[in-house]
Amino acid sequence: LSLHDALPILPLMSKEKIEKALAFHKSFPQYSETPLAELNHMAAYLGLNDFFVKDESYRFGLNAFKVLGGSFAMANYIAEKLKKDVSELTYDELTSDQLRSAFGQATFFTATDGNHGRGVAWAANKLGQKSVVLMPKGSTQTRKENIEKEGATVTIEEVNYDECVRMANKMAEETENGVMVQDTAWDGYEKIPTWIMQ
């Protein structure tokens, strides 16, 4: 089954939606294509002509691809609040005084044990928004500090990951202009995780 053939059964990942996400990310001044690494020995071992792996360690200087989903979800949320399509909002527009006047400022909440939270913090900072990141018991101080460097308020809680998700969601619900940006879905919370996947 080719990607082209699979697209009709993947409406959440349509070509149009993928192109919107790509255009959005390309609008960031920090954007650059990440390299492909050719793995000749793996290709030979698997009996393939070629085998490539996308090296996302260069993505926005964060050493992970996770920033792509969180930032795109945040942009979609802002676009929806402004009754616009995300394709109308480039990085320059999202960081403009006009947008700040029309939208104001949100606080994006998430739970993480690493890269997703760092990506949300980075994107919120770049877009002039706030972020709060809860980390589960056992998270390293180094990961916490890396997220704090991106401008987030970060705490390591004395609970597991799932409980951190519940706590972050409750905090978002109780905070004026609070928004949960989580990379897991549950009943009644599917829109933002869908944007993250796109």
Task: For every predicted segment, state its role.
Residues L1-Q198:
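PLP-dependent amino-acid enzyme catalytic core
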